[in-house]
């Protein structure tokens, strides 16, 4: 049994095995419909319990299809219907019930502490579907997409992030350290990652550089990532924050500083941080990126169940 909570805590050899398995599984599904089961049904009889404390479209759909295609089933719980939320039941007791009824637990949460507490009391694998500090399933899937399109290992590419510092960027930073790729981050100085993340970068002496100039961050990029400037439940003056990111908006002019074959990726949903003429262009691979979540999350599930070949 293995958990999947934060990329920085998972050996890079395991992360690479997940990517290799996902690549193989995607090839085998070329002629199959969405709900057809993979040969061998490796997770037949297994139940994935999911709980979403934050809104979700891609994570919810992709985990639903992932477990179904592996031959298993899934049940999605709404926190507002549980005693955990309204009846004062403890995480310890809830985790015991989840462990008795299910075979794995996927949590999308507004609390890193809650994620760790569930991990402490569960006797089944736990997967982080998004937390305030990280989004590991998203970034591992994005690495899969980058390597699929570029036909190169990510360690040979120049990766750029332009936008706010958030949980997705934290996981991209962890991936940069794990996979040893160059990462340029373009954001206003005020919106750099937390001191904890900066220390993590410094401790690992990685090829990560910050720029208070979007053009400098984009220069020579093979891939440009972005995310919404106004995140879910972001309690800030929205118009003021958007104004501070004006010079970091991704448009055709900014993309011209990157390599000619640079691709644009965005974890979605989008906001005002990218123009339509980039988001809807041939350089944008956001739909392929979203669909690849299914393939990588299948391999993450197999990893957690100890069934990776």
Question: Where do the language-model regions lie?
Answer:
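Positively charged, low-complexity intrinsically disordered leader regions
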Residues: 1-61, 65
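C-terminal helix-to-coil terminal segments
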Residues: 280-309
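Active-site cofactor/substrate anionic-group-binding motifs, chiefly glycine-
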Residues: 47-101
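Rossmann-like adenosine-cofactor binding region
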Residues: 202-278, 283-284
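Short, structured coil segments at secondary-structure junctions
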Residues: 70, 101, 121-123, 179, ...
């Amino acid at each position: 049994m293995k958990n999947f909570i934060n990329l920085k805590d998972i050996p890079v050899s395991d992360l690479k095995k997940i990517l290799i398995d996902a690549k193989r599984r995607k090839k085998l599904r070329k002629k199959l419909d969405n709900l057809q089961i993979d040969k061998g049904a490796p997770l037949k009889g297994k139940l994935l319990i999911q709980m979403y404390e934050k809104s979700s479209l891609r994570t919810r759909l992709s985990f639903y299809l992932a477990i179904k295609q592996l031959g298993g089933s899934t049940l999605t719980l709404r926190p507002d219907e549980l005693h955990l939320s309204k009846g004062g039941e403890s995480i310890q007791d809830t985790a015991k019930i989840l462990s008795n009824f299910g075979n794995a637990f996927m949590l999308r949460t507004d609390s890193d502490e809650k994620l760790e507490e569930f991990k402490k009391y569960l006797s089944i694998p736990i997967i982080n579907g998004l937390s305030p500090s990280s989004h590991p399933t998203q970034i591992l899937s994005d690495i899969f997409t980058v390597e699929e399109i570029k036909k190169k290992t990510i360690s040979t590419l120049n990766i750029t992030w332009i936008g706010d510092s958030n949980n997705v960027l934290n996981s991209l930073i962890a991936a940069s350290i794990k996979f040893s790729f160059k990462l340029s981050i373009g954001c206003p100085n005020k919106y750099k990652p937390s001191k904890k993340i900066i220390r993590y970068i410094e401790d690992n002496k990685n090829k990560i550089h910050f720029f208070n100039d979007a053009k400098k961050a984009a220069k020579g990029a093979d891939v440009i990532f972005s995310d919404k400037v106004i995140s879910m439940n972001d309690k800030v003056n929205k118009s003021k924050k958007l104004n501070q990111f004006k010079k970091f908006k991704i448009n055709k002019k900014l993309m011209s500083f990157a390599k000619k074959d640079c691709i644009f990726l965005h974890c979605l949903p989008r906001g005002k941080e990218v123009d339509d003429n980039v988001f809807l262009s041939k350089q944008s691979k956001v739909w392929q990126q979203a669909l690849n979540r299914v393939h990588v999350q299948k391999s993450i599930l197999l990893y957690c169940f100890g069934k990776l070949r």
